[in-house]
């Protein structure tokens, strides 16, 4: 199944210079250049499928919300991705969530369900939404952290054991990622894996914290559109003044960026 999917859109390992797969190394992470939003979705879906299918055991993926990943998710519910993905071996979690019911249009889990989870043969126990009904924001964050600790098998992060295999992230025009928002107290949280984000500039949310995200084997940013060009350029150049600038990974940080977002890097 892997070989079949590779013909759809191959993922090639990182390299120090740009190659035929349009991979290059800026100051921060590895850039995977994509022609447009559709190409980004295809390359992202191919990467997820090839990665999961190549592993002997389970793969834990943290999904991103927003508009950019939705076409990628929709491809996962179509052939050849639908047959290539080892659904019974993949656990699907969330990088952040708005404190709303799954039926709310703003729900990241609700979007993922509509885009692909309801249309693929994934075991129900492999899908991990945030419980938002009948709990407080703090309880929702603690419950989700407890779920992650159960998956991980420990209450303490270990240097040689990633918490998540792949974490998908978006990038805001203000440099935020997940719900790690500029100037918010959540940026300073270093003793929790999941934290609440009280209502302020945005609605109530919960988010993975830096310690949790940075314990990922691979972090893959999905960045599309000219509105992200300036902030992406600064981050790729090494500017550390944005929340997304402080994302790390046990392996690599990948940037899947389309031509509009990549700008001079394209």
What is each PLM-predicted segment?
Residues 166-211:
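Class I SAM-dependent methyltransferase SAM-binding "motif I" and its flanking Rossmann-like core
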Residues 53-80:
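Glycine-rich N-terminal segment of FAD-binding domains in flavoprotein oxidoreductases
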Residues 63-68, 169-173, 224:
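Glycine-rich beta-strand-to-loop/alpha-helix junction loops that act as flexible
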Residues 217-266:
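ATP/nucleoside-binding phosphotransfer catalytic cores, i.e., glycine-rich phosphate-binding loops
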Residues 24-28, 85-167:
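Ligand-binding beta-strand-loop-alpha-helix segment within the catalytic cores
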């Amino acid at each position: 199944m892997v070989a079949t999917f590779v013909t759809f859109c191959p993922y090639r390992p990182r390299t120090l210079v740009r190659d035929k797969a349009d991979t290059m190394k800026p100051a921060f992470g590895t850039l995977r250049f994509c022609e447009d939003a559709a190409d980004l979705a295809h390359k992202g879906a191919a990467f997820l499928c090839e990665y999961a299918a190549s592993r002997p055991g389970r793969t834990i993926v943290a999904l991103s919300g927003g508009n950019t990943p939705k076409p990628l998710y929709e491809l996962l519910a179509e052939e050849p991705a639908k047959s290539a993905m080892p659904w019974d071996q993949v656990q699907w979690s969330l990088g952040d969530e708005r404190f709303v019911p799954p039926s709310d249009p703003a729900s990241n889990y609700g979007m993922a369900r509509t885009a692909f989870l309801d249309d693929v043969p994934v075991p129900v126990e492999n899908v991990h939404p945030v419980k938002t009904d009948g709990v407080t924001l703090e309880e929702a964050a603690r419950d989700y952290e407890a779920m992650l600790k159960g998956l991980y098998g420990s209450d303490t992060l270990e240097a040689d054991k990633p918490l998540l295999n792949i974490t998908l992230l978006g990038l805001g025009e203000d440099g935020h990622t997940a719900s790690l928002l500029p100037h918010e107290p959540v940026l300073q949280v270093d003793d929790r894996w999941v934290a609440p984000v009280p209502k302020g500039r945005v609605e109530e949310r919960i988010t993975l914290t830096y310690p949790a995200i940075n314990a990922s084997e691979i972090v893959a940013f999905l960045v599309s559109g000219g509105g992200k060009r300036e902030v992406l350029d600064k981050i790729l150049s090494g500017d550390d003044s944005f929340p997304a600038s402080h994302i790390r990974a046990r392996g690599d940080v990948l940037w899947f960026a389309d031509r509009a977002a990549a700008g001079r890097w394209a």
